[in-house]
Amino acid sequence: MERIKELRNLMSQSRTREILTKTTVDHMAIIKKYTSGRQEKNPSLRMKWMMAMKYPITADKRITEMVPERNEQGQTLWSKMSDAGSDRVMVSPLAVTWWNRNGPVTSTVHYPKVYKTYFDKVERLKHGTFGPVHFRNQVKIRRRVDINPGHADLSAKEAQDVIMEVVFPNEVGARILTSESQLTITKEKKEELQNCKISPLMVAYMLERELVRKTRFLPVAGGTSSMYIEVLHLTQGTCWEQMYTPGGEVRNDDVDQSLIIAARNIVRRAAVSADPLASLLEMCHSTQIGGTRMVDILRQNPTEEQAVDICKAAMGLRISSSFSFGGFTFKRTSGSSIKREEEVLTGNLQTLKIKVHEGYEEFTMVGKRATAILRKATRRLVQLIVSGRDEQSIAEAIIVAIVFSQEDCMIKAVRGDLNFVNRANQRLNPMHQLLRHFQKDAKVLFQNWGIEHIDNVMGMVGVLPDMTPSTEMSMRGIRVSKMGVDEYSSTERVVVSIDRFLRVRDQRGNVLLSPEEVSETQGTERLTITYSSSMMWEINGPESVLVNTYQWIIRNWETVKIQWSQNPTMLYNKMEFEPFQSLVPKAIRGQYSGFVRTLFQQMRDVLGTFDTTQMIKLLPFAAAPPKQSRMQFSSLTVNVRGSGMRILVRGNSPVFNYNKTTKRLTILGKDAGTLIEDPDESTSGVESAVLRGFLILGKEDRRYGPALSINELSNLAKGEKANVLIGQGDVVLVMKRKRDSSILTDSQTATKRIRMAIN
């Protein structure tokens, strides 16, 4: 205040004003400051005084031929003076106006293509809906957000190669376009931008916007997808928010959202299989999202979510060094600890072995709806400052922090036994046992925690055990703050390892992630997710399992048939039959399996009883561990559509229907593909015609390797011997004839020889 008074005083004296407005600036330091270097020191001032001059713009000499000296109003458009220090002319801003009105018009066809991101944004805003403005305190936390809607997910290097190839194809320099997306984009853009007159540099800038994800660390309350971020300045102020619904979708947000859903489904499914890590990798490699391979998306997409990070870790990619517990992302900001195993007793006198972190540490905790700062010592919570959207969210954060603190009074607050299991029916580790227990009911925990008197601190209030705010008292060490805690800003990625149970550890052995941390939230993906792996057939329910199992058999029929005759056990153990077992009533699975295996054995033994349709129909039932019994079945039950439906052993049923004339198979009324029976099956004759050009030598001889299918025989050299599988599921040894002349007689002798070889 004093300074301002003093200045006001000075200004009121006329001499002061005169000195300030009239004196020349000739102090060397000041001149140096404003004249050294190419960088403009005060651009807005420069612009203002330039525009006050008559001819502030310089232009190429050609302008004098294209623009008249004066406009209709007789104002001069350019000066005959040439610009000092260059051979350009001095031009008035009026010349620009004249040019815009009367200058030549070029083709505009490329503008929407080059400035695609802008045109798209206008469309989104045109179709977006702005709702009412609400005045309320905004809890904003800084998060790393995508500020560039509608981009592909190329790395900076990949994008650079694409841009050089599209915009400067003749420039020297090695450019390697390897990824599918790079090639597609390059081809597409080259076609779009043929004969484009827009300056190459501008095109390059715009392409970069389309190809690369740009992120900024911004204060956000509410939606974080790029479509919301582009209108951040319209939707949230310091004390107000405006509702907004985007118009249209952008691919990158859809990819992020669908990737999270696919990763969660895959991790949940892998966790219950016999070898979770192998299964997870198999699924990631065989899944497509919106037509792009999931593994390609994982390599490029920086989304940080528990399931996505587990998939990345499995692929050997680096991930963020923060760890996850109870759905919150923890980042240690100071301190350190060592781990030690300790046995503790719950309130129910159950013994738990927990890994205790000894030492003082500080963490930030960031969740979807709440954030916190946690300071803890060995098995003691020192301080927790929480902020969240509502009481429920604040309570969730408090429970997670208290469990994480490992305090004794938390463990003593357990009532009843802890026996939570994961999806694979394995017991959860003790920390997750405790977490689940209190997430179900935290009343005792909050009641026993203890309360304390609090000092009045700006922006902080106390919170009572029933989660109501108070200015006098609070749960011990816990306060609620109006300010959020910023997300961890670093984009640093670390090398991690993953074990077969999908637990991800950093190089010091700390567990960063595990399947228990994967959210159970179900959502609907915005892009089509295609899971080719049999493990994911269940995701769309029992019908999908049924159809997919039979389609898989038909697609792989040639190899299935050979395995069926040579190594049935290996065939029955194939993972593709695993999902099907959940459809067969548990009590009878074993009997069905024993029955079908016996039936198949007869097919192998008795000439002429081989039946393609029946074999395909019954094969999935043979996969369960068989129980030997004398039971015969005329139909087998599967649980679909909420009840048991029957598959007839001989003949068609609504579940499995094969039309001999059209060769089409329908499963539950849905077309499942074409099924080609072996040529002579209906007459149960011999495939002699197919064996023309081959001499049948006798029974199968294992020394000549696994049986070939009829189709594979054509690859044999003359005189070469091989085992071959003929129509009835029998295997015989054949030799390719050395001469073609005797082919005719083959058909007659084949029939006799096969009978002899088999019997």
Curated annotation (Swiss-Prot):
Motif Nuclear localization signal mapped to chain: 736-739
Molecular function per GO: RNA binding; RNA-directed RNA polymerase activity
Site (Mammalian adaptation): 627
Keyword tRNA processing recorded: no
Record GO cellular component, one term: host cell mitochondrion
Principal location: virion
Keyword Ion transport: no
Compartments, as annotated in UniProt: Virion; Host nucleus; Host mitochondrion
InterPro entries per UniProt: Flu_PB2_2nd, Flu_PB2_6th, Flu_PB2_C, Flu_PB2_CAP-bd, Flu_PB2_middle, Flu_PB2_N, INV_PB2, PB2_helical
GO BP term, pick one: DNA-templated transcription
Membrane-spanning segments: none
Keywords for the protein's UniProt record, in alphabetical order: Cap snatching, Eukaryotic host gene expression shutoff by virus, Eukaryotic host transcription shutoff by virus, Host gene expression shutoff by virus, Host mitochondrion, Host nucleus, Host-virus interaction, Inhibition of host innate immune response by virus, Inhibition of host MAVS by virus, Inhibition of host RLR pathway by virus, Inhibition of host RNA polymerase II by virus, mRNA capping, mRNA processing, Viral immunoevasion, Viral transcription, Virion
Family (UniProt): Belongs to the influenza viruses PB2 family.
Subunit structure: Influenza RNA polymerase is composed of three subunits: PB1, PB2 and PA. Interacts (via N-terminus) with PB1 (via C-terminus). Interacts with nucleoprotein NP (via N-terminus). Interacts (via N-terminus) with host MAVS (via N-terminus); this interaction inhibits host innate immune response.
Purpose: Plays an essential role in transcription initiation and cap-stealing mechanism, in which cellular capped pre-mRNAs are used to generate primers for viral transcription. Recognizes and binds the 7-methylguanosine-containing cap of the target pre-RNA which is subsequently cleaved after 10-13 nucleotides by the viral protein PA. Plays a role in the initiation of the viral genome replication and modulates the activity of the ribonucleoprotein (RNP) complex.
Name of the protein: Polymerase basic protein 2
Species name: Influenza A virus (strain A/Memphis/2/1978 H3N2)
Encoding gene per record: PB2
